[in-house]
């Protein structure tokens, strides 16, 4: 139902289909959305190339690194051509190199016109890529605004970020 409304979702925990290859993970969604086998193949090839995972096409999902797994999950999510994607803790459980890759992928999604909503405790990485931020405290909105507005807010620094917080 969510996908039919144009919403993609990537949970924090691994959502890859472990018993499938990389290409079969993506095809599992394409087959639901694209009736033409030739169009499925074209879209599969495009997604594999876009996310630099073509060389992993026949690899088992179990053999992937955290960053590779995340790229496959994002490619699979895009197979349904969502208008918006909710990313739950996209920076959790991945190595520092993969953090940069995920940041680049999120920027590319924004450039494609896909709305991206991120929930993450890794504020430093998240504030580097968002246009607007919303800081919640005890279930209430503490501050919303641009990353700079949020970082400079005294209450946010006192309650959540800490006085010495900076984005480097």
Regions picked out by a protein language model, each given a short descriptive name:
Residues 85-89:
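Catalytic Walker B motif of ABC-type/P-loop ATPase nucleotide-binding domains
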Residues 81:
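Conserved catalytic motifs of ABC-family nucleotide-binding domains
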Residues 60-64, 68:
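Conserved ABC ATPase signature
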Residues 1, 20-39, 50, 163-164:
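ABC-type ATPase nucleotide-binding domains, specifically the catalytic core motifs of the NBD
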Residues 27, 38-56, 104-107:
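Conserved ABC ATPase "signature" region
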Residues 74:
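Hydrophobic anchor residue at the start of the ABC signature
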């Amino acid at each position: 139902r969510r996908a039919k409304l144009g919403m993609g979702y990537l949970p924090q925990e691994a959502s890859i289909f472990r018993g499938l290859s990389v290409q079969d993970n993506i095809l599992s969604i394409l087959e639901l959305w694209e009736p033409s086998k030739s169009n499925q193949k074209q879209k599969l090839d495009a997604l594999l190339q876009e996310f630099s995972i073509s060389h992993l096409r026949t690899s088992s999902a179990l053999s992937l690194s955290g960053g590779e797994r995340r790229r496959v999950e994002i490619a699979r999510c895009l197979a349904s051509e969502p208008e918006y994607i909710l990313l739950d803790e996209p920076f959790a459980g991945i190595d520092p190199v993969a953090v940069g890759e995920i940041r680049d992928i999120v920027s590319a999604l924004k450039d494609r016109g896909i709305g991206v909503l991120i929930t993450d405790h890794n504020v430093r990485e998240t504030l580097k890529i968002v246009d607007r931020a919303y800081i919640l405290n005890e279930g209430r909105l503490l501050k919303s605004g641009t990353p700079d507005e949020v970082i400079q807010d005294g209450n946010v620094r006192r309650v959540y970020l800490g006085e010495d917080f900076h984005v480097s």
